Amino acid sequence: MPMDFQPTSSHSNWVVQKFGGTSVGKFPVQIVDDIVKHYSKPDGPNNNVAVVCSARSSYTKAEGTTSRLLKCCDLASQESEFQDIIEVIRQDHIDNADRFILNPALQAKLVDDTNKELELVKKYLNASKVLGEVSSRTVDLVMSCGEKLSCLFMTALCNDRGCKAKYVDLSHIVPSDFSASALDNSFYTFLVQALKEKLAPFVSAKERIVPVFTGFFGLVPTGLLNGVGRGYTDLCAALIAVAVNADELQVWKEVDGIFTADPRKVPEARLLDSVTPEEASELTYYGSEVIHPFTMEQVIRAKIPIRIKNVQNPLGNGTIIYPDNVAKKGESTPPHPPENLSSSFYEKRKRGATAITTKNDIFVINIHSNKKTLSHGFLAQIFTILDKYKLVVDLISTSEVHVSMALPIPDADSLKSLRQAEEKLRILGSVDITKKLSIVSLVGKHMKQYIGIAGTMFTTLAEEGINIEMISQGANEINISCVINESDSIKALQCIHAKLLSERTNTSNQFEHAIDERLEQLKRLGI
């Protein structure tokens, strides 16, 4: 899936800004006035800004436009009525236009465009209802409406508030006869080139205009939702950043950046100035909503830094995810912002663990072989069954005749799939399942430099009376994970953070590391 983009020799003076659905729903005026206009003004940090928006959500993803559109697809496949949900979406966006767009002409056009897009959705769903089937292509077409409505609104709002902007629809950027069968290198290469063509008029324009791109980027092989998931808007923003050779990709959220732990659960959690791409990927996978891993693959290979920032605190520095090894201009650089070379270098040297996160709704399956198959056949059959029912394994521990696996089961559909898989797994041996568990993951690229971190983590849990159901640690030691009861997850976060990630712990580690370095110097000098 990754592709080898070659870094160019100069910056483009562009920044790509991606805004999530809840940010668009709750803070649209702040986005335009405090962020887009600030970065795009002649004396601003960047002269050129490209905006990418997710589908609008008023409060949560569950109540957002995309979730409602997917619900319509479910109803159409069951030949049920979906008209009421479409009307809720329409009224929500019309009310939004009436509330925020002051110019009558801009408001009227926005309302008209909104109605047209939703009429198209009705046509797609009515056709599917007649056929009794909703294809992945239809799901993509219906789902794209959410990003279109969001970007139409943000374009109108920008123009209404004196920031010239133009709506750019990417839903047909992939031609229907495109031959690629998967989201592979050829697809991403094609898409970046197509995006360059879309961006060309803005790059060459004498007048500064902000392009507002739909986060949905066309009908793709296997379907966008199946192939990428709900993080496709992040990926779209990343590909646009690569296409324009951006100075920076900014992902705007409702938090100040990446913390050492969830500050809602650990009040002492600290904001991190920088993390490595590997750390960000691990934190995302094991529970922290940082950024879609596919997104990082694209921009990091193009040597473009990613900055996580807060729409409610636009002047904050945020957290930067900086490319390893080679900078955009080609020089060697450590994985941190260039403006903080010395301080970040020593911070990286001294810190063992970077952050801790938890992931709830975990089930652990233990399978003991009936010894009717060889060990490699035993494992192969297990994963064949899990793949059939689309079950994902987060952690695994194996021996020749026993396998323990931690699986995320976040909803009723996943639970149904697990029960179906359980029946097949019992053919291979005895099966027992434990539910209401949580994965606790300690993440840090430099943990392997410190002896005893895993021991300290598990000892800390034991001292707090927290039972460990399962342990997993990779050879690269970037992630140490264990499974505990879900009811103990917050206590586990707090006690491990206090032991390994607090300011006091960092100061102590710095002192110990300084002593170790001095002893090593004396040893080399033969003293």
UniProtKB/Swiss-Prot annotation:
Activity control mechanisms: Allosterically inhibited by threonine.
Modified residues (Phosphothreonine): 333
CDD domains: AAK_AK-Hom3, ACT_AK-Hom3_1, ACT_AK-Hom3_2
GO biological process per UniProt: 'de novo' L-methionine biosynthetic process; homoserine biosynthetic process; lysine biosynthetic process via diaminopimelate; methionine biosynthetic process; threonine biosynthetic process
Cellular compartments per GO CC: cytoplasm; cytosol
Effect ascribed to mutating residue 452 to D: Disrupts threonine binding
Result after altering residue 25 to D: Decreases affinity for aspartate and ATP
Enzyme Commission designation: 2.7.2.4
Reported phenotype of the disruption mutant: Inviable on medium lacking methionine and threonine. Sensitive to amitrole (a compound that increases flux through the threonine biosynthetic pathway). Decreases survival time in an in vivo model of infection.
Residue intervals of the ACT domain: 442-527
Alphabetical list of SUPFAM superfamilies matching this protein: ACT-like (SSF55021), Carbamate kinase-like (SSF53633)
Annotated keywords: Amino-acid biosynthesis, ATP-binding, Kinase, Methionine biosynthesis, Nucleotide-binding, Phosphoprotein, Repeat, Threonine biosynthesis, Transferase
Pathway stated in the Swiss-Prot or TrEMBL entry: Amino-acid biosynthesis; L-methionine biosynthesis via de novo pathway; L-homoserine from L-aspartate: step 1/3; Amino-acid biosynthesis; L-threonine biosynthesis; L-threonine from L-aspartate: step 1/5
Subunit composition and interactions: Homohexamer. Interacts with FPR1; the interaction is direct, plays a role in feedback inhibition of aspartokinase by threonine, and inhibited by tacrolimus and sirolimus.
Family the entry assigns: Belongs to the aspartokinase family.
Protein's name according to its UniProt entry: Aspartokinase
Organism: Saccharomyces cerevisiae (strain ATCC 204508 / S288c)
Taxonomy of the source species: Eukaryota, Fungi, Dikarya, Ascomycota, Saccharomycotina
